[in-house]
Amino acid sequence: MMSKISTQGIQLLFMLLLARYISPTDFGTIGVLTVFITISNVLIDSGMSASLIKEKDITSDDCSSLFTFNISISILLYCLIYACSPFIEGYFQIETLSRVCKLIAIPIIVNAISIVPKTLLVKALKFNAIFWVQFISQLLSCVITGICVVIYEWRLDALILYYNLAAIFPSIGYVLWMKYIPQFKIKKQSIRKLFGFGIFNTLSNIVDTIYENILSIFIGKYLNVTQVGYYSQAKRLEEVPSRSITDLICGTSFPLLCTNNEDTGWYIRKITQIQHVLYSIMIPAMMLIMIYAKDIISLVLGDNWVQAGPYLVLLAFAGIWVIIENTNRTFIKSLGRADIMLWTSIIKRTLGIIIIVFSLLVSSAYLLYAYIIASIIAALINAYALSRLLPYSLMQQLKLWSQSLVPACFFYIVCAVLYNSIDTYFVLLPLTGIVGILYIITLPLFGVTDIRQLLKEFLLMAKSAKKC
């Protein structure tokens, strides 16, 4: 888990540095294509790598069949994207998008090569090997791309180069580390065995992937590609806390929840504690991002990106509900109900798309507000689904949310008043810190008791993550 966060941190830092050299338009050009590449990568795997990990006895035929299947699907998908690239360019009306599409899709095939050797490393619990392959690959990709940006003044082509190198280097690393020699053969029995497990999870991931990237498509179509660039970088910044910390806590708590999910009383107490830890930290953090959005953009990306500020404000507010939604999704997954995950994803994303499309019919200016409404509804749907699996009613969950949301709202109001009243950061930041301490002290008044125990649990989770 920590290796994943470390490599993602390098990628994030590098992308933020690139933003000082590369225009929002170039980032937006890549952003509108993200959905096609991400969906392709989900389809290539089809959940079968998880099956390879799950199976106790695997044969060389299983590995060869999976490798051949992945390569075949990846080539098919690349050819499909290659053929559709002129139509994609016509839809978005972005010059040279067809060429970019053909080049940025190359990692689809490259990533397919690495699935089997990487899965074998995971199955062998060689997490240190995975970390070093990813870490070194990211460093090499960043250094080579950085040289091309600074010395040769590459811009859009530098982004294309980076995404290709970030796929090529790990694939080479996994193959060399495992000394994996692929065989091009396929056995129906192996495919049938591997394909059965994880199909619900895969379909759910596809639905979520389409939805998570659909805003880039709509913004690129109904606004312009520059706005996609602003949106994509704001989204990248918003996901630093909302995704990374949430993934850390949920990822480390998931195995624990799986071990004793039949003891309903213990399970409900544990998920209540996890939510108190996560929400008490993350909700005020997202509200601080809302307040300091413009300053964060200027500091991290530069003044050329200041128009990304309003995107960051709205995405940070939506991020609060995404955190709640993803937490409940982890709980449903830990109960072994991948079928429920699929159906809730279909319902949530269908409603979300309807709301977003309706907002476009009114005005494209309401696009992100529609996304916020859809995020709140999605969180409520996941909460309702969890209430059907456990004696843990929707009202009980809403009460738990309010125990963090209400004090966080007071925290937001006070910090916002301070921000708008004080001009110097030397006074503003210490006062904000004092307000944060008061927020923690007052949490027991709202039902979040034993703060020290909650922080202790959080530290234990972080230590567990380091072992991964």
Where are these regions (language model features)?
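Membrane-interface junctions at transmembrane-helix termini in multi-pass inner-membrane proteins
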Residues: 51-60, 110-133, 147, 178, ...
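Transmembrane helical elements of multi-pass membrane transporters/channels
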Residues: 2-11, 137, 159-174, 189-259, ...
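Signature of the first transmembrane helix
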Residues: 1-48, 73-87, 137-142, 146, ...
